Swiss-Prot record:
Keyword Cell membrane: no
InterPro entries to which the protein is assigned, alphabetical: Uncharacterised_TM-17
Keywords: Cell projection, Membrane, Transmembrane, Transmembrane helix
Keyword Transport found: no
Name used for this protein in its record: Transmembrane protein 80
Amino acid sequence: MLFHLSGLYSALYFLATLLMIVYKSQVFSYPCNCLALDLVLLLLMGILKVAQLYLGTKGNLMEAEVPLAASLAFTAVGGLLSVHFLLWQTLVLWMDSVLSTVLLVLHGLEAGLQVVVIADFIR
């Protein structure tokens, strides 16, 4: 259930963040190199999220530790990218903070449950 909620929220987050980056580039003086970096990191975050959800679902259905461990690693990297969009982005709007905080909470819940499930599968 959490994977479905996370996947749905990540799609919303990706779209909202993309629109906010476009907005910031039009309204504010946003450096081009920072704009390109933010767009590349957002695209990387989307690709990692798809891989994380696929491996997490596959590992959960097969009760296999390796896909879940890979999904946990992708969750950690996704959390770091969320921190980037929360704190280290060139311009951080209030909505960026809210969306990234909710995404970090979801990453934390996913990571905690993945650790518990991996420990259960190893036993």
